[in-house]
Structures are given as structure tokens and as C-alpha cells.
Swiss-Prot record:
One of its GO terms (molecular function) is HLH domain binding. Has a particular type of basic domain (presence of a helix-interrupting proline) that binds to the N-box (CACNAG), rather than the canonical E-box (CANNTG). Residues 110-143 form the Orange domain. Residues 34-91 form the bHLH domain. This is Transcription factor HES-1. Pfam families: Hairy_orange (PF07527), HLH (PF00010). Residues 1-44, 158-204, 256-282 are annotated as: Disordered. The gene is Hes1. CDD domains: bHLH-O_HES1_4. It comes from Mus musculus. Residues 164-174, 182-202 have a biased composition (Pro residues). It comes from the Eukaryota. SUPFAM superfamilies: HLH, helix-loop-helix DNA-binding domain, Orange domain-like.
């Protein structure tokens, strides 16, 4: 009897049907589900990349700083990053110093570039609506502080920008068709006869209308061209108040001096009563 029951159970079509026939197939995964399922794998790969980069960075920074790697075998990630930042800042300062020593205009270019970037950031923050007000204020304040520090920078051998004297203005030469501004080689020294210092504001001499119009002021002295092509220097009284260096007087395009001797402005006791020194007189 038990054998007959076993035969009936084995011959039943329901028992012979596999269980997988009654189950429904799996639905395809959506993009979000796929991201969720692959997120642990991506996180593991990201951590592995970070650790590998930090390991290489640790080796490089210890070699650059010439430190024994055996004594720094257990450095934290934050320590490695801080050492790298300090090393890069030192390299940047060294490169800036070397560049300034070879070309002083580098600092001006750097200031101009930083100022342009700061203006662009300010322009963007003033038009962008999604930036927090506190963040905007802090960022602009930080850029302003950096700009102040950059303006205070000087290259080796240069004084502070606020202490530098402005360059002297280029002198204006006397009027003439073929005369360039006074910049010849060391000029001959010419004696300054007496009486060459009229009081300020007084008319120096009676020249023609064209000669009077051509009179120019050069370096504190009034230059009066003579009809024969030479020039006369009118020296104010203040030039003889204190002793000073010898005053060079330039002559016409012939390049010759009127006299072989030279006197100092302090020799005011030998002045004569002439109102003006005329080099064309012998």
C-alpha cells in the first residue's frame, strides 16, 4: 500500500512542475536603485584613491623637507595636508622673490592681475542673487585684506611705495629749431660773473619781442636766447644764499665754453653791478 501512494505522488503533474515556473521575473532596476546598489562600491574606490594619493604625498613632502620617514611613519591625514600647504607657500614666496630680483616689473603685473580678479569677483557677487550676504561680505573683506598686503609688498632694493619720492619731471629745453633738451655729456664749467641775479619779478633785460617770447624757465633759471644763437641764464638771488656746487652753464650748439674757469655760487662778494651776464660780450 505505501508503494502505491509513492507511485501516485511521483506521477502527479503538479509535483513534477518546477517551483520557478510559478515565480514572476525580476523588474529592471531604475537609475536611482542602481546608484544605491553601486554606492558602496564607488565609496570604497574613492577612499582607496584618497589613501593612495595621501601615501604618495607623504613620501614626496618628507623627501622635500628632508625629514626621516621612519620617524614620521604615523602621520595623520591632516598633518600631511598642512605640511604640504606650508611647503607650497614657501616655494611660492621663493619664486616670487627670485622673479622680483630679476625683473622688478613682475610685482606691478601681479598687483594688476590680482586687482582685476578682485574686481571681477566683486562684480559677480554684486549681480548674483543666490550668494549669502554674510558669505559675500566675508569674501570681499578677505580680498580687500589680501590687496592691502600685496600693495605693501616690495622687491629687494626697493623702498616702500609710500616712501618713494616721485620721479623728477623731465626738463623742458629752450626753444629752438635744432636744439634738443639739455642732456649732453659732462658740460664745461663756465664762470658766473657778478650782477647775474636780478631781484625776483623784475625784467631781466630789454630784448626784442621775439627774444622775449622765447625766454624759458629751466631748472629754476630763466633761459634767454641771444641773437647770435647763444643762451643766457638768469640766476635768482636765492642761488647765492648758501654755498653749493658749481653751476654748469651750457652754451650754444658749438659746444664750447665761454671761459676756462669755474666759480662757486658762494662767491657772491665779487658780484658787479651788471643786471645780467651776457656771454656774447667779451
Amino acid at each position: 500500500m505505501p508503494a502505491d501512494i509513492m507511485e501516485k505522488n511521483s506521477s502527479s503533474p503538479v509535483a513534477a512542475t518546477p517551483a520557478s515556473v510559478n515565480t514572476t521575473p525580476d523588474k529592471p532596476k531604475t537609475a536611482s536603485e542602481h546608484r544605491k546598489s553601486s554606492k558602496p562600491i564607488m565609496e570604497k574606490r574613492r577612499r582607496a584613491r584618497i589613501n593612495e594619493s595621501l601615501s604618495q604625498l607623504k613620501t614626496l613632502i618628507l623627501d622635500a623637507l628632508k625629514k626621516d620617514s621612519s620617524r614620521h611613519s604615523k602621520l595623520e591625514k591632516a598633518d600631511i595636508l598642512e605640511m604640504t600647504v606650508k611647503h607650497l607657500r614657501n616655494l611660492q614666496r621663493a619664486q616670487m622673490t627670485a622673479a622680483l630680483s630679476t625683473d622688478p616689473s613682475v610685482l606691478g603685473k601681479y598687483r594688476a592681475g590680482f586687482s582685476e580678479c578682485m574686481n571681477e569677483v566683486t562684480r559677480f557677487l554684486s549681480t548674483c542673487e543666490g550668494v549669502n550676504t554674510e558669505v559675500r561680505t566675508r569674501l570681499l573683506g578677505h580680498l580687500a585684506n589680501c590687496m592691502t598686503q600685496i600693495n605693501a609688498m616690495t622687491y629687494p632694493g626697493q623702498a616702500h611705495p609710500a616712501l618713494q619720492a616721485p620721479p623728477p619731471p623731465p626738463p623742458s629745453g629752450p626753444a629752438g629749431p635744432q636744439h634738443a633738451p639739455f642732456a649732453p655729456p659732462p658740460p664745461p664749467l663756465v664762470p658766473i660773473p657778478g650782477g647775474a641775479a636780478p631781484p625776483p619779478g623784475s625784467a631781466p633785460c630789454k630784448l626784442g619781442s621775439q627774444a622775449g617770447e622765447a625766454a624759458k624757465v629751466f631748472g629754476g633759471f630763466q633761459v634767454v636766447p641771444a641773437p647770435d644763437g647763444q643762451f643766457a641764464f638768469l640766476i635768482p638771488n636765492g642761488a647765492f644764499a648758501h654755498s653749493g656746487p658749481v653751476i654748469p652753464v651750457y652754451t650754444s650748439n658749438s659746444g664750447t665754453s665761454v671761459g676756462p674757469n669755474a666759480v662757486s655760487p658762494s662767491s657772491g662778494s665779487s658780484l658787479t653791478s651788471d643786471s645780467m651776464w651776457r656771454p656774447w660780450r667779451n
